Amino acid sequence: MPFFSKSQNSRKDASTPSPMAHIFGMLLSGALGISILGLWISAASVYIDPRLFKWVGVLGLAFPIFLFGTLFLWIIGLLFVPRKTWLLGLIGLGVCAQRIYTYCPIHPFIDNETTTATTNQIKVVSYNTFFFGRGMEQQDELVRYLIDQHADIICFQEGEANPDNLKKIESRFAPTPTHYISYEGTQEEVVGIISAYPILEQKLIIAYPGNAIYGYRLQHPRGELIVVNCHFRSNLLSGPTLEGYTDMMHGKSKEDKRSQWNNTKTLFSKIAHSATERSEMVDAVEDYLAQHKGKPVILCGDFNDTPVSYTRYRVASLGLTDAFREAGQGFGFSFRRNAIRVRIDHIFCSKDFEPIQAKVDEEAPYSDHQPISATLVWKNEKK
């Protein structure tokens, strides 16, 4: 009997964690809980109009930070203290599953490299061209790239403002199927469309200095098609601001802590202010689409906002489908500059279409943005 009692105590001692292990588990669980809370707050920020609380524009940008932080802490927890962390991490990520999928969709059975064009499809390309590459040689290459996409609709933002260069671009597209061209703007911004379908009308929906949204009525063989080309309000971040932020993130900043803090506040303040202006632009888009209710819609452009943002959420709430979410793959970063890697260019469509392919071409070297494309299929034959 004594021997049996000793064996029981040995097993009990072996299963009891040491004080250090217990403290580590508690700290890890606490850190995981804080990261999950941040993840939930950033995910929920899409429901809040920045005009009510401007800092939600910054909270959405923090989503990937909290996401990767949560994943990292959860994996560490599963390796060392699984009993304390497995359920917590599962619940934390599960609650945000839809938002995570929007940020990084996975479609293993969709081939975005090959496509067979049919009359039942529309291929759309949206590209912030950074003034068509700035420089004639790169401009020629960029135009050649767009022609080679064999798209039915090309929407561009930050187009070429020089009238002579615009005429040259028009002449390049003249012998192609996409020879209908319409553009408008100033020295600060040119927004335009290149289409395989006749352009019935171009209308300015709303504009800010350097940003504008235009609506187009196209004559498609199936009937009138509405296209909205968006360049939502930019965050107005200058090159030095971005470089300073990059240096700080990489621990290479030569500024003192106070200067770093002031620069960070300036950066966040600009992002927050621009988010409120994007909200006003979404209102204008909603009013425009209400005027064309019942007609098929394609909406695309440079949103200057990520998949986890009020702008993107509001556009989707207008009854539009996010093509990249439905048929894209991975993060699809469309803007890569300094330490910033985000998808801020998007393509949406009305329920008249089904996206079957969507892709961000991360190899195109002509602009500070990457072009995004989508192939849309008409769901029903025209009655």
PLM regions and their residue ranges:
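Metal-dependent phosphoester-hydrolase catalytic domains
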Residues: F3-K6, A21-L79, W86-G92, L204, ...
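Structured beta-strand-rich core segments of catalytic domains in phosphoester-bond hydrolases
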Residues: G94-T119, F131, G135-Q138, I147, ...
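Cytosolic juxtamembrane amphipathic/interface segments immediately preceding
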Residues: D13-M20
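Short, aromatic- and cysteine-enriched interfacial helices/patches
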Residues: M1-F4, F109
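Residue-level marker for buried hydrophobic side chains located in beta-strands
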Residues: V124-V125, C155, L299
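Stable alpha-helical elements in mature extracytoplasmic
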Residues: Q138, L142, N165, I169, ...
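Active-site metal-binding loops of divalent metal-dependent hydrolases
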Residues: Y127-T129, G159, F232, D302-F303, ...
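Acidic/histidine-rich helix-loop elements
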Residues: S126-Q139, L236-S274
